């Protein structure tokens, strides 16, 4: 009885809750009885067989004779049998391990079976030598949980054991563990105990979905939360990667996919001055003194309107040019907010500068100067009072902040929150048709600005992994009309009829994108809700999303680069932004069902759709990467690939990493698979291989790119070790098929540029070799661009690159 006294001491020390105390006491008492009954002088006491209920029934006069039908042996564990789940018949089975119910995994012993079930994983009788270890494991678990409660912290509901952190959850965990401990003593009692422990578990939603409460990180200098659909939360859900990458600065450190751990640390961008007070209070005259001569200002204004896609529909070009002329005539009489708007236009124009001349100062220096002047104009004009041009100036400033960093910045989201609240204060969430004193021109411009704010809110909130700030029920503002700036101005008494939907305008793009954003926002609301959505709700939103994308005008529908020969860079990028948003919405809607779909056919559509969308995302990433290289069609527009766009690529990368991680752990290397599954795995590896190349090149200037390169490189290395080298070489030579093997979801063929840049076993030219060694900083300037004449393939060259001098600038 000594174990009972020890357990009582533990209970008295760590059990402040009466329900928890009773659960723990019950657990240790039952475990102690089992130990006392089973463990003697180093051997097991004989057990009496369980009572035969059928024989007892025969002795009763009122009972009918027993059925002569032969009982079907139960091969699955008790919990899998009750839930009708697939069981691999191990001890414990994989399903119970994944659900955190390892200690509750018990089997009903058929008549005449061997006295003990052998644990195939350990090669020893389960429940005999393993019984003290189970009790010790349970004691350590409860001690840890009680320490957490005693420290005043609420244990996370996402920890593997127990299933939840409430007192009821502790009771269920204790009952389940006691049932496991009693399994070896009496099979009949074990079944009853396991059934009672599983009753409350059956009430939980099936299948066991991925965590929908997100991830929270609490550190000394920072506390951060992201929703479960954020790419970092998905990455954190891969346990092996979570342990390996506790710090994103860790390197992969293994061939043939070396991580960029030796690269220099990216510099921290400046924080938004308007949020943190990093500005000087100056007068209006001092602000005007920073204005450049008009010819140089004209050049910057022209640059802005030529490249207006980064900040569309904020400024009405016709009206702005009239006000621009009046400003040069009477600069001191111009409202300070309009001057801030002009500095915003000039700042973006300087950021867009592609060519530098002796007459134009350094554009980067101008960006810093004009960024400061925008803040000073907003402060002098008291932006909280919401004077005219306030929101327009703030939106230009928001675009400037997006260009300051290649990584996600929560400060930008906070700045957007200021803009949203000012827009609500100015009534932009109510359609101007309710207010007759607002002119048709002002009403239409308010609709344009509000549409842009709604879009920024939804996309930026998803980028930082938080719920959006604007709800659909709070606004009735109509869509802006498809009008050119030349169609109306401030003198218009009524708005003209809109242009046909096939006419490509900045407003057409905003309207088409916002219709997908509206469904995207509903998806974000559904998956960030505290109430778990039902699968029919998910499928209904899936259908709405597909219908909305099909309604996008044909000119904005994505098409291969080979069919876009006559289209400009602006049109190509608009198509790509829309299709990336569509695929991102698909991934966010379905990714929680990817793992359950492997054992439950009801969710096969979600897995196939999510993986196909992620493959599409990385296919577009590879196309965009190649077209923005020197000589590519989008090279001059490469700066438009902002952190908002890259966040979609991060999501696609992590989803395919999760898919590959499941294949690495669930599928034996020599397992027979269908051609569809093998083809899908090859597509996933090929897509991650291409994505790894992109992230590796960007890792010098982006922390997020470095983390993505580390993760994808680690998984690719493990995939190469597990599967046959011949299959991996086949992956290196393959191009994505035109049809996905899943559910008939089409995967577009790679462009000619993409196919030519894909890894193939051909002699490598010097630019191709440098593509895989950007972090090495090796000077190859004295070598020509002719082929090296090597017979090695890309995988061999990647392995060789580990011996290159990565920390030294050594000429070759």
UniProtKB/Swiss-Prot annotation:
Single annotated GO MF: DNA-binding transcription factor activity, RNA polymerase II-specific
Gene Ontology CC terms: nucleus
Biotechnology and industry use: As colorants, MonAzPs are widely used in various food products for centuries. Moreover, MonAzPs also possess wide-ranging biological activities such as antibacterial activity, preventing hypertension, lowering cholesterol levels, causing hypolipidemic effects, and displaying antiobesity and antitumor activities.
Keyword Disulfide bond attached: no
Pfam families, alphabetized: Fungal_trans, Zn_clus
DNA-binding segment(s): 77-105
Functional description taken from the UniProt entry: Zn(2)-C6 fungal-type transcription factor; part of the gene cluster that mediates the biosynthesis of azaphilone pigments (MonAzPs), a complex mixture of compounds with a common azaphilone skeleton very widely used as food colorants. Acts probably as a negative regulator of the azaphilone pigments (MonAzPs) gene cluster.
Identification of the protein by name: Zn(2)-C6 fungal-type transcription factor pigI
Keyword terms: DNA-binding, Metal-binding, Nucleus, Pigment, Transcription, Transcription regulation
Organism for this UniProt entry: Monascus ruber
Chain segments carrying region Disordered: 42-74
Stored InterPro entries: Sec_Metabolite_Reg, Transcription_factor_dom_fun, Zn2-C6_fun-type_DNA-bd_sf, Zn2Cys6_DnaBD
Keyword Ligase set for record: no
Cell compartment(s), UniProt: Nucleus
SMART domains (UniProt xref): Fungal_trans, GAL4
Induction info: Expression is negatively regulated by the transcription factor sir2.
PANTHER family referenced in this protein's UniProt entry, alphabetically: UNCHARACTERIZED TRANSCRIPTIONAL REGULATORY PROTEIN (PTHR31001), ZN(II)2CYS6 TRANSCRIPTION FACTOR (EUROFUNG) (PTHR31001:SF74)
GO biological process terms on file: DNA-templated transcription
